[in-house]
């Protein structure tokens, strides 16, 4: 019996959602952070989308956001020329890292001791979070603003992307190992530690490269311009979203398009699989995040599979929420929660 994809809609942001990231799996589940042009990154329970808190302090659009592995710290990159590190449990601001231009990307090392940043000033910076007064190490070499920067290979190397170039750096020597040039703008990068795979999107292309050597593995072509793509943790599927408001799901091994569907009311800017692979999240120009099931119909999070009577002739549809909660009621709850904030709302530091 056919099942219909019914996403969970996470409201609360008032401007386009431009970045999102999941934590690792913790004793309390896993968590999701979103970056938005409204300047108010939000933290949510990863498997349900339930709002937990809003980090207040930035004075401009937030372009990048990430969580460390155990979800105890968050980091954000913003148009106010700062990156900030937060206590993800209390919501308190821990430090503000001043930059000379707009900051677009942040990433923690596995031990959470260092933070990598990149932005419009074309420099990669590495901050020792145990020495907040120390000057960061700087890596130069990009010729345009940096869109994404990621630690890889157990933090021994760094991957970074500017407009049309992806570069691989050695952390110890701070030197470039290799670079890839593209004939159009790189829109996103994702690093998969298991297998050392780098996912790159540009134009309508979704390309997979070795994160160690940058050698090509395979590539797929989508029907529309793609802004972001994510590979399933078990490398069975990949999902991608872009300018046509659609999400596409592909078989990673064959490249076959398995399904495509709309849900957002604007271009999709970011998409990521959860760490357990049970769902993926998307963020859009329409100001919402949506959570989608990898396997439609499975009881998971707020999805409860409810099958109609066999003789009804209806499509089976996964019911969202607890048995007594309607989809409309969940939307109302999300709207009410959108005005809530962490009890601590730190002021921006100079």
Swiss-Prot record:
What residue spans do the WD repeats cover? 12-56, 57-96, 98-137, 141-179, 180-212, 221-262, 263-302
Q: Any idea which UniProt keywords this protein has?
A: Cytoplasm, mRNA processing, mRNA splicing, Nucleus, Phosphoprotein, Repeat, WD repeat
Q: Does the keyword Acyltransferase apply?
A: no
- Domain of life, per UniProt, equals Eukaryota
Q: Which PROSITE patterns match?
A: WD_REPEATS_1 (PS00678), WD_REPEATS_2 (PS50082), WD_REPEATS_REGION (PS50294)
Cellular component, GO, one term: nucleus
Q: Which InterPro entries match?
A: G-protein_beta_WD-40_rep, WD40/YVTN_repeat-like_dom_sf, WD40_repeat_dom_sf, WD40_rpt
State the compartments where it is located. Answer: Cytoplasm; Nucleus
Q: Briefly, what is this protein's role?
A: The SMN complex catalyzes the assembly of small nuclear ribonucleoproteins (snRNPs), the building blocks of the spliceosome, and thereby plays an important role in the splicing of cellular pre-mRNAs. Most spliceosomal snRNPs contain a common set of Sm proteins SNRPB, SNRPD1, SNRPD2, SNRPD3, SNRPE, SNRPF and SNRPG that assemble in a heptameric protein ring on the Sm site of the small nuclear RNA to form the core snRNP (Sm core).
Protein name listed in UniProt:
Serine-threonine kinase receptor-associated protein
**Species, as recorded:** Homo sapiens
Biological classification of the source: Eukaryota, Metazoa, Chordata, Craniata, Vertebrata
């Amino acid at each position: 019996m056919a099942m219909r994809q019914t996403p969970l809609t996470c409201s609360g942001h008032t401007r386009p959602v431009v970045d999102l990231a999941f934590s690792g799996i913790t004793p309390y589940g896993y968590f999701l952070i979103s970056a938005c042009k409204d300047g108010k990154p939000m933290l949510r329970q990863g498997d349900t989308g339930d709002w937990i808190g809003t980090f207040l302090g930035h004075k401009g659009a937030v372009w990048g956001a990430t969580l460390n592995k155990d979800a105890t710290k968050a980091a954000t990159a913003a148009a106010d020329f700062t990156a900030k590190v937060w206590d993800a449990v209390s919501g308190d601001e821990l430090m503000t890292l001043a930059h000379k231009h707009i900051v677009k990307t942040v990433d923690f090392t596995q031990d959470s001791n260092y933070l990598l940043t990149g932005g419009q000033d074309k420099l990669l910076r590495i901050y020792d979070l145990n020495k907040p007064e120390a000057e960061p190490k700087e890596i130069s070499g990009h010729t345009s603003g940096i869109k994404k920067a990621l630690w890889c290979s157990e933090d021994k190397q760094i991957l970074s992307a500017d407009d049309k170039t992806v570069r691989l750096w050695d952390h110890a020597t701070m030197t470039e190992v290799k670079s890839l040039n593209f004939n159009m703008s790189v829109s996103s990068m994702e690093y998969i530690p298991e297998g050392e795979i780098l996912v790159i999107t540009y134009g309508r292309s979704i390309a997979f490269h070795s994160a160690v050597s940058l050698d090509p593995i395979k590539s797929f072509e989508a029907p529309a311009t793609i802004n972001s793509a994510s590979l399933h943790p078990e490398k069975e599927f990949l999902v991608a979203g872009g300018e046509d408001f659609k999400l596409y799901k592909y078989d990673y091994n064959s490249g076959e398009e398995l399904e495509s569907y709309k849900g957002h009311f604007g271009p999709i800017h970011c998409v990521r699989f959860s760490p357990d692979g049970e769902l993926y999240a998307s963020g859009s120009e329409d100001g919402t995040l949506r959570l989608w099931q990898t396997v439609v119909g499975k009881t998971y999070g707020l999805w409860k599979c409810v099958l109609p009577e066999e003789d009804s002739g209806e499509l089976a549809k996964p019911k969202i929420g607890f048995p007594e909660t309607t989809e409309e009621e969940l939307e109302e709850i999300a709207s009410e929660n959108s005005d809530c904030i962490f009890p601590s709302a730190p002021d921006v530091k100079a």
